[in-house]
Amino acid sequence: MSDDYYPWATAIRSDRMLGFQRLTILGATTLAFTPMLALADNARDWQNLPTDLNMVFGYYNRIDTNTPIDTSLPIDGLSLNANLYIARYARSFAIDGRNSAIQILQPYADISASFDNSRFFDGTKHNGGMADTQVVLVHNLFGGPALTKEEFANWTPETFMTGALWVTAPTGDYDKDRVINIGSNRWAFKPEIAFGTPIGPTWLELNGYVSLYGDNDDYQGNRTLEQKPLYGVEGHFSYTFNRALWASLDATYNRGGETRIDGDWQDNKQENALLGASMGFMLSPQFGGLIAYSDTVSERTGSADVNTWTLRLQYAW
């Protein structure tokens, strides 16, 4: 394969090509998901990549759930189908010798909703618009040194721990008189710790996070919505078939998030578990994607019951 096919490789000797091929597949699968809307990460999202790398992502998510688009807020009797599209940009850089990154996500949702008990309306309602913008700050704690593309080509992946802070701004479409909104009309912060270790051709990854919510003072009219933290942990066990293909088994567990409306606790603490699988692929050293599926296998009464298909395409340069 010529350097025209690997445009980053012009400064890398042919005996380093194997490492460079690893660079392209890792670089295009890192920092790669939409944990937006209380969804989980994907496998290999937080592995190391070279510094000064730009990445753009496009997502299509098909979601069937008993919640609004903000999946931290189940509503009794609700059945919602959503087509969620997300544009995402990420750039990596060095801080104090460790790899860091900043990401920006802008979702758009097209939804249809109905109620089994006609609690709020009859029939099916449709809505579409922009969801809340997210900014993500990422910094490696160990196992992810800041490396140029040439240095990364000769580097062997190692056990790592990375921290991230997700900030969700209330920029999405919101109407206080609607039952089902696309925006959440509140700030949210999600600190996250991601751990991963390579085991031969496999990766074992464990992530933990907590979602912290601001108040919504215009909830279903002029009521005030408060919510306790929602805690989550997830695991991924992935296998590398070759430099252009890997697959993963995924699991997620969430607990907490009880809400209070105008000072009255709603006795709706959430608890659910999801299982899924995913497959990442590369079509060229810069262009690739992912297909993923997850489904709720156990949930406490009143908790989120979510079924999600995800298609992601990404390009790195």
Outline where the language-model segments fall.
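Transmembrane beta-strands of outer-membrane beta-barrel proteins
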Residues: N54-V56, S100-I104, T159-L165, F189, ...
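Outer membrane beta-barrel transmembrane domains
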Residues: Q220-W317
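Outer-membrane beta-barrel pore domains and translocons
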Residues: Y59-I63, L105-A109, N140, W166-P170, ...
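Surface-exposed strand-loop-strand hairpins of Gram-negative outer-membrane beta-barrel proteins
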Residues: I63-L84, D122-G123, K176-I180
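Repeated loop/turn-to-beta-strand initiation elements of outer-membrane beta-barrel proteins
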Residues: N66-T67, G97-S100, G144-P145, P201-L204, ...
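Residues on the lipid-exposed face of transmembrane beta-strands in outer-membrane beta-barrel proteins
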Residues: G58, A87-R91, V135-L141, L165, ...
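Residues that define the transmembrane beta-barrel architecture of outer-membrane proteins
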Residues: D52, S79-Y85, H126-V135, T159, ...
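Outer-membrane pore/translocation modules
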Residues: D110-E226
